[in-house]
Amino acid sequence: MRLLDGRSMAAEIGRYVIDEAERLMLAGKTPTLAVVLPNADPAARSYTHIIERTAGKVGVRCEPHEATAGPAALLDMVDALAADPLVDGIIVQTPLPAQLSSREVGEHIPVAKDVDGMNPESLGRLALGLPGFAPATAAAVVEILTRARIPMAGARVCVIGRGPVVGKPVSLLLLAEDATVTVCHSHTKDLVTIAHEADIIVSATGVPGLVGAGFVRPGATVIDVGTAVTAAGQVGDVDAAAIASVAGALTPVPGGVGPVTTMLLLRNTIRAARAD
């Protein structure tokens, strides 16, 4: 089984980001990503540190902003960043305050600065094939398949999960690559049978070990987007040991989709800065 190394792919994208950041800085522009933290969630703060560290290596300024005083303060913070000409990209970490939906928060992020595709308009533009930013995790799936030279045109793809961050947008991105996409979810009947017919499986449920050997046809590619923390550490949706003798390729967890997602956020920030 071939392991699709997200870290090496992220490094390749990073070289492009470095070059583009240098060009922007020579023109007097420092590409800047604002990360809004609505609470003290440890996972969100840990990921923000990863973004900061990665951004520092590729020439993008990453600015964390605390917005923990409640829903109104969060929206005020996003509005201020939206109006700030020095800020090129905005992301808001989750979980959000219970009183706010991702749609409500996303509507306050201008599409031009919506580098993680949180604004509903961004998803609409994606559905219509118009220019814009897709959610970075969904985009990372297609980026990995492209860089691994795994054909998508004509491929049968099973997407497990229909959420707005991965499932829905990745299905649209794969359709744009001429794949034949089936989206499965908690009410899907015969999930194992559907998955076993696929050339590519994309799983984004957060259920550890959901995808076992019975899901995977010989030679299929499996993209594991799920992540959960267990007593054994960080794990994905896929039982890697169970499918190792069957699958043709797999993204590991950690080290697969995650590093590419982070770098795509920074590449999107570069593109937003360049457009500005």
Curated annotation (Swiss-Prot):
Keywords, in A-Z order: Amino-acid biosynthesis, Histidine biosynthesis, Hydrolase, Methionine biosynthesis, Multifunctional enzyme, NADP, One-carbon metabolism, Oxidoreductase, Purine biosynthesis
- GO CC annotation terms, alphabetical: cytosol
Q: Does the keyword Lipid metabolism apply?
A: no
All disulfide bonds of the chain are none
Q: Provide the reaction this enzyme catalyses.
A: (6R)-5,10-methylene-5,6,7,8-tetrahydrofolate + NADP(+) = (6R)-5,10-methenyltetrahydrofolate + NADPH; (6R)-5,10-methenyltetrahydrofolate + H2O = (6R)-10-formyltetrahydrofolate + H(+)
- Stated EC number for the protein is 1.5.1.5, 3.5.4.9
**Biochemical pathway:** One-carbon metabolism; tetrahydrofolate interconversion
Return any one Pfam family short name: THF_DHG_CYH_C
Tell me a Gene Ontology molecular-function term this record carries: methenyltetrahydrofolate cyclohydrolase activity
The record's annotation in SUPFAM superfamilies points to: Aminoacid dehydrogenase-like, N-terminal domain, NAD(P)-binding Rossmann-fold domains
**GO BP field:** L-histidine biosynthetic process; methionine biosynthetic process; purine nucleotide biosynthetic process; tetrahydrofolate interconversion
Name the positions where NADP(+) binds: G161, R162, G163, S186, T227
Note the HAMAP family from the entry.
THF_DHG_CYH (MF_01576)
The record's listing under PANTHER family reads: C-1-TETRAHYDROFOLATE SYNTHASE, CYTOPLASMIC, C-1-TETRAHYDROFOLATE SYNTHASE, CYTOPLASMIC-RELATED
On assembly, the entry states: Homodimer.
Free-text function comment from the UniProt entry: Catalyzes the oxidation of 5,10-methylenetetrahydrofolate to 5,10-methenyltetrahydrofolate and then the hydrolysis of 5,10-methenyltetrahydrofolate to 10-formyltetrahydrofolate.
Question: What protein family is recorded?
Answer: Belongs to the tetrahydrofolate dehydrogenase/cyclohydrolase family.
User: What is the official name of this protein in its record?
Assistant: Bifunctional protein FolD 1
- Source species, please? Frankia alni (strain DSM 45986 / CECT 9034 / ACN14a)
Q: Which gene encodes it?
A: folD1
